[in-house]
Amino acid sequence: MTLNLADLRQRYLKDGLDENNTDDNPFVQFEKWFHQAQKSELLEPNAMVLSTVNEVNQPSTRTVLLKQFSDDGFVFFTNYRSQKAKDIQHNPKVALHFNWLELERQVKIQGVAAKISLKDSMRYFATRPKGSQIGAWVSHQSEVISSKQLLLSQFEKMKQKFQSGEIPFPDFWGGYMVVPQQIEFWQGGDNRLHDRICYTLKDNQWVKQRLAP
């Protein structure tokens, strides 16, 4: 079967991105765009694609949720026994990608991932809904399971076990911070003349440049 998508295209007609109107600090620029994405009521504006590479140089992507960001980096949480965690242990160089289609915007981040402190992971875990806390215990992420029903059954057992009192913190779960080395802001443009403003960290200083689309 062949599916021809040659005529499937979209014009980008929103305002362009002028480097003179972008902040010299990429984190400030990201915060500005992120708040605009929130105000636009996009579905999970904090959803980002995380790209990793395994021990045989096979790349993988998956969507995770940004839970914190600051001038230090971008934080997400996961099971430390998952495939993504194994990939990061092998090669901590990763990429993040935010795709805000309704705003005709993308943000691409290249950096290095490292585990955050146990204290910070525990603090965030305590804020999660009880069902999500139980889910962290039940799901042996990336492992083969016989059925969805088995997972639901295990969830109910854990729910009964922890029906009273706090749910303990799983030591195989926690956060990663991606410390960026390059951050690119992309704004769609008419006739495919897109705007690309790229910040690269050089000698502990952010260098801002315009890239050809």
From Swiss-Prot:
The keyword Chaperone does not apply. Substrate binds at R9, Q10, R11, Y12, K67, Y124, R128, S132, R192, L193, H194. InterPro entries: Pyridox_Oxase, Pyridox_Oxase_CS, Pyridox_Oxase_N, Pyridoxamine_oxidase_dimer_C, Split_barrel_FMN-bd. One of its GO terms (molecular function) is pyridoxamine phosphate oxidase activity. Binds 1 FMN per subunit. PROSITE patterns: PYRIDOX_OXIDASE. Its EC number is 1.4.3.5. Pathway: Cofactor metabolism; pyridoxal 5'-phosphate salvage; pyridoxal 5'-phosphate from pyridoxamine 5'-phosphate: step 1/1; Cofactor metabolism; pyridoxal 5'-phosphate salvage; pyridoxal 5'-phosphate from pyridoxine 5'-phosphate: step 1/1. Keywords: Flavoprotein, FMN, Oxidoreductase, Pyridoxine biosynthesis. Transmembrane segments: none annotated. It is an enzyme of class 1 (oxidoreductase). FMN binds at R62, T63, V64, L65, L66, K67, F77, T78, K84, Q106, Q141, S142, W186, R196. It catalyses: pyridoxamine 5'-phosphate + O2 + H2O = pyridoxal 5'-phosphate + H2O2 + NH4(+); pyridoxine 5'-phosphate + O2 = pyridoxal 5'-phosphate + H2O2. The keyword rRNA-binding does not apply. Its cofactor is FMN. GO terms for biological process: pyridoxine biosynthetic process. Belongs to the pyridoxamine 5'-phosphate oxidase family. HAMAP family: PdxH (MF_01629). Catalyzes the oxidation of either pyridoxine 5'-phosphate (PNP) or pyridoxamine 5'-phosphate (PMP) into pyridoxal 5'-phosphate (PLP). PANTHER family: PYRIDOXINE-5'-PHOSPHATE OXIDASE (PTHR10851:SF0), PYRIDOXINE-5-PHOSPHATE OXIDASE (PTHR10851). Homodimer. This is Pyridoxine/pyridoxamine 5'-phosphate oxidase 2. The lineage of its organism: Bacteria, Pseudomonadati, Pseudomonadota, Gammaproteobacteria, Thiotrichales.
